[in-house]
Amino acid sequence: SARSGTTIIGKVIHSLKGVEYSFEPPALFSLIPLIESIKENNWKMLYETYLYEDFFINSICGRSINCNIADDSSIYKVKSKSSIDARLIKSVDKVKAEKIGADRVIAYKMPDITPFIPKLIEYYPDMRVIFMERGPIETINSLLAKGWFSKNGSTSNMTWPFVIENEIKIPFWVCDKDSDLWCAMSEIDRCAYYYIRVNNVNIPNAIKISYEDLILDPLNTVSELA
């Protein structure tokens, strides 16, 4: 079963016709936090190379799809076997892949990148953003249960990428000026900092989905995405 609201919504989006979906791409977790520190043309070249050349074309050709049926992000969870088989039984060159992909769109799921989305939208104004909303108490309780920001969690690789200071791994979404503050914080204060950091962002025209609505009334909630 899906582990979180974002995973559920990701599966719904992946199931839509003409959508090529990337689940938490590691390359973008490294690249997106650098959006302010790399020249715009260089950053966009790297971003578009990954999304289009590496992911999109290879997804259409059946080379970068997740065929592990045990994974929540498996293509077999959301697409018909016949449509998947059609990708896997023949070799497709780039010219043909581009023709097939002419009426398709790219979607990707990436939690925790909201502080960087305004700049991303500045670069790509037609980009559409779906934002999962969850209350602070529920979010903090969930984080405490996972222990990601505990003394042990802060030395693990659960939040990646990170920088290391005083043997503590500081998540990529922590402001540079707050590094020392993060190291001194208690676990619950880190959870509160996280909630504020990823929610206190103005994202114009974002589609907002309530986690509580998704759980209580999934059909009507996901119908907003159709």
Regions found by a protein language model. Give the residues of each.
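Active-site micro-motifs of SAM-dependent methyltransferase domains
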Residues: 15, 21, 27-30, 138, ...
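PAPS-dependent sulfotransferase catalytic domain
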Residues: 86-96, 112-115, 141-224
